[in-house]
Amino acid sequence: MHRFRIDIEYDGGPYAGWQRQAGQHSVQEAIEKAIAAFSGEEVTIRGAGRTDAGVHALGQVAHFDLSREWKSDKVRDALNAHLTLAGEAVSILRAEAVAEDFDARFSAKARHYLYRIANRRSPLALERGRAWHVARRLDAAAMHEAAQRLVGKHDFTTFRSVQCQAKSPVKTLDRLDVTRVGDEIEIHASARSFLHNQVRSLVGTLKKVGEGGWTADDAQAALQARDRAACGPVAPPQGLYLVRVDY
């Protein structure tokens, strides 16, 4: 068997998420159909991050195996041709032949996410579905201060979905930075792995700080409560991007 890695960009808006789901259209299904169309083989691909419905990717990574050897450029171009023909909002940025022990999910050393908040009075037109529109002016400096209280190895029970299937709520958050760029607030989060809904839960809590309703101490207290009920409202999916996966 020949193993291939693909780097993927997609608009999460039209999809029920990355993972294949019965009766719903997923990014995984779209790519698997494209692989079958050009190779004649039915495969199951494994992705580095199982993004939710509406979440985008600039640098998702996946792998799959084919019985026949193919040139990497041919794999990329053939997949893109079939994805385009099918009207999918998915682009294969790169394809590469890799060792058989490479695993897009379990070989990953770090995952990097970006959350975009469009912080302006006027609603979004061109960027609708690409960012969270928040009309009220947010204090990015206060949000960043609170974010630093959440960095490190912690029990993140407060910031994970009740549907999260991870065996342990303990994760090491390597980076959580908040910066303002004009009318946009960018929140960058990095870790080896994340809990389900962790980034969006963190963003929702930081927004409460930015509005002045919470302080950095309140955000830290929410973390220490280890109680989902202590979390701020979960941020919507359209502002979240899987930017890069490190190996």
UniProtKB/Swiss-Prot annotation:
One MF term in GO for this entry? RNA binding
The record's active-site residues are D52 (nucleophile)
Q: Name the top EC class.
A: isomerase
Record's SUPFAM superfamilies?
A: Pseudouridine synthase
Name any Gene Ontology BP term.
tRNA pseudouridine synthesis
Tell me the residue numbers annotated for binding substrate. Y113
Reactions catalysed? uridine(38/39/40) in tRNA = pseudouridine(38/39/40) in tRNA
Q: Which InterPro entries match?
A: PsdUridine_synth_cat_dom_sf, PsdUridine_synth_TruA, PsdUridine_synth_TruA_a/b_dom, PsdUridine_synth_TruA_C, TruA/RsuA/RluB/E/F_N
- What EC identifiers does the entry list? 5.4.99.12
* Pfam families named in the record: PseudoU_synth_1 (PF01416)
- Alphabetized CDD domains for the sequence: PseudoU_synth_EcTruA
Q: Could you tell me the keywords of this UniProt record? A: Isomerase, tRNA processing
Gene3D superfamilies the record matches: Pseudouridine synthase I, catalytic domain, C-terminal subdomain, Pseudouridine synthase I, catalytic domain, N-terminal subdomain
Q: Which domain of life is it from?
A: Bacteria
Q: Does the keyword Ribosomal protein apply?
A: no
Outline what the protein does. Formation of pseudouridine at positions 38, 39 and 40 in the anticodon stem and loop of transfer RNAs.
Q: Which family does it belong to?
A: Belongs to the tRNA pseudouridine synthase TruA family.
Q: How does it assemble?
A: Homodimer.
Q: What is this protein called?
A: tRNA pseudouridine synthase A
